[in-house]
Amino acid sequence: MDRHEHFKAPANEDELDDIDDDMVVGVIAEIEQEVLNESESDDDEYDLVDMGAPEPQQADGHSSSNESISSDGSFDPNAEDSDSDDSMIDEAASGGASSAKRRKEQTATDGVGASGSGASGGADYSHLDDDDETDETVRAIIAAIKKPRSAPPEIKLEDFITDICFHPDRDIIALATIIGDVHLYEYGNEENKLLRTIEVHAKACRDVEFTEDGRSLITCSKDKCVMVTDMETEKLKKLYETAHDDAINKLHVLDERLFATGDDAGTVKLWDFRTKDAIFELKEVEDQITQMLTNEQNKLLLATSADGYLTTYNIGARKLYVQSEPYEEELNCMGIYRGSSKLVAGTSKGRLYTYNWGYFGYHCDMYPGIKSPISLMIPITDRIACVAGEDGNIRACHIAPYRNLGVVGQHNMPIESLDINCSGELLASSSHNNDVRFWNVKYFEDFGDIKYNEKHNAYKEKRHNLPSSKCTNASDFFADMTKDQDDDDNDGGNDTAAGPSNVT
């Protein structure tokens, strides 16, 4: 290592005495000159300017690039360094704030908010281009963002949602709440718009239905009243005050003139819009009526109850038609399938019971189901049903023969209500989390019929996620890997040097 000539090792101790103060002064002067040259270099000057520091002024007596060097060239170790860490950080921060302000102004000019969504239908992601990205993950995220929605976004309310119902003709959905209000939303794939909120009941509105022409809303409540309200004017058209002696739980519209109600004590009543009082009433069970329905002929009215009975009423004769044997579980829901030849009922133990139409005394077939309570059922096609309950999953199943087709959608909490729109393409569900989610189920149109002797894996079917589900299947990931491997193998197969064949 080269040494400065003033610091060469002395030959003996006498040479140390020969070093005088002039030599020390000379060394200090050289160090001062080196520091001064470095501080005045062009590179350091540009670096400081780029970091936001003020440009050094000319030698006019007001300032210098390094205040630690005095005007006479002497070095003052106690002088304050103008380029200290604190000053540099403050100036860099001010420069960064200016850059952030410019970015914010540019974002406002482009019209894209920080939230990425709004009443106008959401943010504009057209400027994103996945072709410019090399990272596969980033490209996948951009592609998912730009992918058009196939179902409306989620609706979130502050109050508990007790029931939902689609309009028979328009893209409108009614949401009944626990405080007695009904919210009407116009839904679309890009946004949902609140049309109006109708205050109908003093207590919880338990069920809401549209009339067949879609002009009026029928609601029942815990306050024992039934109300018919004009959907457009919000005016009350008819009030059935104290329609039942107990809280009303279910409604069912038969046609343009008739509708039925069922209460918590098991009483069923049939009403005519043109009259003030009920046409008839029957009490054949002692517990809550959970669901009511009829077929197209409207000759029989069926009702399930929480005490395990399927009760059938003859509408024309206004009397009991038949009542099933009691079940040791609640019958919560039902649907008609196979050309109105089969009735399927769901239970609190997750079972599905099948009845031949007209023979409702006892079931002809039973499917173990999903081992989780089934509280809701909606027919999607003549052979496919969607069921939901306390586990928060909406599952599709094939009727006669029974097969689990997979999971249609999910909620984080138990599902409270389920309905399908007039076109049969959109399914809506509400949960205990005060939310309504939409699921596009149009893909069921392409499902083929299932044969009785067809082999299947019940374990995989129960956990399989359908296209509308927010979850993906692990097998889909490995299927893509297999596909890529097959493509590579096919490319290599065309090369004679790819390797020896395994064929013997």
From Swiss-Prot:
Belongs to the WD repeat WDR55 family. It comes from Drosophila virilis (Fruit fly). Residues 1-21, 33-132, 477-504 are annotated as: Disordered. The keyword ATP-binding does not apply. It holds the Pfam family WDR55. Residues 12-21, 33-48, 78-89 have a biased composition (Acidic residues). Residues 63-74 have a biased composition (Low complexity). It comes from the Eukaryota. The keyword Repeat applies. WD repeats lie at residues 156-195, 200-239, 243-281, 284-323, 326-365, 410-449. InterPro entries: WD40/YVTN_repeat-like_dom_sf, WD40_repeat_CS, WD40_repeat_dom_sf, WD40_rpt, WDR55_POC1. Gene3D superfamilies: YVTN repeat-like/Quinoprotein amine dehydrogenase. This is WD repeat-containing protein 55 homolog. SUPFAM superfamilies: WD40 repeat-like. Keywords: Repeat, WD repeat.
